[in-house]
Amino acid sequence: MGGESTIKIMPMLSLRDASRASAFYQSAFGARELSRSASGEGRIVALLAIGEAEFGVVDEAPQVGNLSPETLGGTSVRISLVVADPDAVAQRAIDAGAELIFPVEDQPYGWRQGRVRDPFGHHWLVGRPIGETA
C-alpha cells in the first residue's frame, strides 16, 4: 500500500458517555488513556490503548451517523481481546460492570474464550488460543 511501513486498524467506539467509558475500560481491561479532547459541541473523544492496541471512544453524534449500541439497540461488531489470563480479565470486566454473555471456557474451535457486554453495549471476546499465552 504505497510504501507504508505500518498499517494499523484503530476502532472508534461510539458511546453515550465517552468519559465514563474511558474510566470503565481503564478499570476493566487495564487500558491507558493516551489523549482526550472535546469538540466545539462538548463531545468527548479519547484515545486509549490496551497493550499496544489503540482504540478510540467518542460521544455519539447522531447528526453525523455516529450512533452508540444503546441507540441502535445492539451491535454487529465483537472486539477480541487476546490475553494471557482470560478468566481473570473477564472477571475484572464483570466486577467493573460488564454483563456476562458466555463464560470463559475451552471452545471447540481451539480457544479458551468468553464474552462480555460492556455497560455501553459493546461486546468483548476475551480469550487466547488453548495451550498458548498472549
Segments and roles (model prediction):
Residues M1-M12, A23-R117, G127-A134:
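Vicinal oxygen chelate
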Residues F120:
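Conserved ATPase active-site switch/coordination loops adjacent to the nucleotide-binding site
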Residues L15-D17:
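Conserved beta-strand-loop-alpha-helix junction that forms the acyl-donor binding cleft
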